Design a protein with these regions (language model features):
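Paired acidic/hydrophobic, glycine-rich loop segments that form the ligand-binding mouth/hinge
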Residues: 55, 203-204
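Conserved alpha/beta-domain cores
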Residues: 1-190, 196-198
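Expand to "…catalyze enediolate/carbanion chemistry for C-C bond making/breaking, isomerization
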Residues: 193-197, 204-211
């Protein structure tokens, strides 16, 4: 994924790419447009392209973009979640995809409401140094979450071959079923088709839509 901001976004190109992906996902998954690398002044191009659901990775960028386009999109938070940012993020989003630490649970207990809904990030591959709850501890973590948990999210180890993600996505689907959870946020531009095969209900796309 590019690490520089997208400029001069072509709404027609985004619309065409989005329509193709939405057609593939129809009846199975929502298409979330990851806007981490979209500057606030380019968000209007996403409006013009017909984007409805966006995900942001940083609290500060979420606040700035939401202020400019609050009513234009449904907003999710998909980035690394710092406990000290929970209070600022909650009022702006439909879902937080990345709950995975006890300190975040504490802040959700303080600032969550009856409407708060989250996904638990699961470190399915149990990679060292990577965020998320280990599969063995998932049921206990869900039980301790003070707000509604509606699903799970994962980021599998990066691999050139999208098929390498399949066992990790399949495992997340098994964990969701075992815990009676409906939402599965998995799959990015690189492996979204595999994620759809394995039951994703939200796929998170960025560079694939802007190219």
């Amino acid at each position: 994924m590019p690490r520089t901001l997208f400029h001069d976004i072509d709404p027609a190109r985004v619309r065409a790419n989005l329509e193709e992906v939405t057609g593939e996902a129809a009846g199975r998954a929502e298409v979330l447009v990851a806007c981490k690398y979209v500057p606030v002044e380019e968000m209007g191009a996403l409006v013009e392209a017909g984007v409805g659901l966006v995900g942001e990775n940083r609290q500060q960028d979420l606040a700035a973009k939401h202020e400019a386009h609050a009513a234009d999109f449904t907003w999710d938070f998909i980035g690394n979640l710092q406990s000290r940012k929970v209070r600022q993020i909650l009022p702006l989003v439909r879902l937080i995809h990345s709950v995975g630490t006890d300190s975040v649970l504490e802040q959700l207990g303080r600032h969550g409401t009856a409407e708060t809904e989250v996904l638990i990030e699961v470190n399915v591959a149990e990679e060292e140094g990577k965020g998320g709850v280990a599969p063995a501890g998932l049921a206990d973590f869900i039980a301790r979450c003070p707000v509604r948990v509606s699903g799970l999210m994962t980021m599998p180890p990066f691999a050139e071959d999208p098929e390498a993600s399949r066992p990790h996505f399949a495992r997340l689907a098994e964990l969701a079923a075992a815990n009676d959870l409906e939402r599965l946020s998995m799959g990015t531009s690189q492996d979204s088709r595999v994620a759809l095969d394995e039951g994703a209900t939200i796929i998170r796309l960025g560079s694939a839509l802007f190219a």
